[in-house]
Amino acid sequence: MQTFLKGKRVGYWMSEKKIKKLNFQAFADLCRKRGIEVVQLNLAKPIEDQGPLDVIIHKLTDVILEADQKDSESMQLVQRFQDYIEAHPETIILDPLPAIRTLLDRSKSYELIRRIETYMQDERICSPPFMELMAECDEDTLKILEKNGLAFPLVCKTRVAHGTNSHEMAIIFNPEGLWSIKPPCVIQSFISHNAVLYKVFVVGESYTVVERPSLKNFSLGASDRASIFFNSHNVSKPESSSVLTALEKVEGVFERPCDEVIRGISKALRQALGISLFGIDIIINNKTGQHAVIDINAFPGYEGVPEFFTDLLNHITTILQRPDQSANKSSVEQTGSSLGERLCCTPPARTDPWIVETDTSGSVKLQSQRLGCNSSVSPSFQQHCVASLATKASSQ
């Protein structure tokens, strides 16, 4: 039975490109059938004049990044948005700006995943160790790599996890290849995963898993192979094919992701960040069968998710039906306050045998990482590609 919510108003802001790509007008029509009015916001004008608003859906990632680069217009837009949020704590924001900023920084999001894994203590999950490279590599860099379990081949990504440049990546096979890398960037150990990526598209408590091709397997250890530079977005398009994804044969373990594991990771991220609309890229280690989270994306494209609008409307309906919207907002942000504080605020205990504390030089920042999940290599990396819908489930 459908719930009718007459008088409720949902505002949204996203780029015209994303509006067209999602065909968001269809979502607005779906909402109106439930009595919900949908309003496209103009951030160049006072939001107060466009209210009242019960929920705001946004994709402000580009604007936030431009504001961080001191673009005056973007700074004004973000400030206007923030001012409205502070003046209207009863309005539900999908999703909170602090959470979006975390997901825009790969170093921060990888650290969050590491803490989530430590908190969950699930041996079926082990994401790659990573380093943040702040300056050009030297001999000390190689020593830190070796000391902390990062092994060739390595995957190099931009620290910023959004925008065209964020898809520019490299696979580095030897020390010589490191010299050509331009910092700042994030480095992860690559792990073979039989050229399969699982993209998890989350909408509140529901998620859909889409299977896509990924990078083929590469042998562990340094080699004289030249570095491979590529654009992961081009490799990942559903209609694309690439020699980088051509798998000659399946090697080692070939397992599909476990629903229980995905549900747990999704729930932990929702609780830690208070987010509802995000994507998780997962690969399966072909030596251990462990799940590795290799990227988290704010408000992804939801390609291959035919029921995205239905899931989104159901999620909005659920949060609007809660007794007190202000209480609801605090629950969204604080549901996992205990978990969030432990994951995001509390430094890991130095006595914890699973944690390697930061050991840095002036040029390299090594994030704390779990060791022991794979004695030979650590899982890795961000890759996507062509798609078929795999599974749909509820994360509760």
UniProtKB/Swiss-Prot annotation:
The ATP-grasp domain, residue ranges: 117-325
Superkingdom of the organism of origin: Eukaryota
InterPro entries from the UniProt entry: ATP-grasp, Inositol_tetrakis-P_1-kinase, InsP(3)kin_ATP-grasp, ITPK1_N
Gene Ontology annotations of biological process type: inositol trisphosphate metabolic process; necroptotic process
Pfam family, one: Ins134_P3_kin_N
UniProt keyword Isomerase, yes or no: yes
Binding-site positions, Mg(2+) 2: D295, N297
Top enzyme class: transferase
Recorded GO MF terms: ATP binding; inositol-1,3,4,5-tetrakisphosphate 6-kinase activity; inositol-1,3,4-trisphosphate 5-kinase activity; inositol-1,3,4-trisphosphate 6-kinase activity; inositol-3,4,5,6-tetrakisphosphate 1-kinase activity; inositol-3,4,6-trisphosphate 1-kinase activity; isomerase activity; magnesium ion binding
Chain's role: Kinase that can phosphorylate various inositol polyphosphate such as Ins(3,4,5,6)P4 or Ins(1,3,4)P3. Phosphorylates Ins(3,4,5,6)P4 at position 1 to form Ins(1,3,4,5,6)P5. This reaction is thought to have regulatory importance, since Ins(3,4,5,6)P4 is an inhibitor of plasma membrane Ca(2+)-activated Cl(-) channels, while Ins(1,3,4,5,6)P5 is not. Also phosphorylates Ins(1,3,4)P3 on O-5 and O-6 to form Ins(1,3,4,6)P4, an essential molecule in the hexakisphosphate (InsP6) pathway.
Family under the similarity heading: Belongs to the ITPK1 family.
Name used for this protein in its record: Inositol-tetrakisphosphate 1-kinase
Classification of source organism: Eukaryota, Metazoa, Chordata, Craniata, Vertebrata
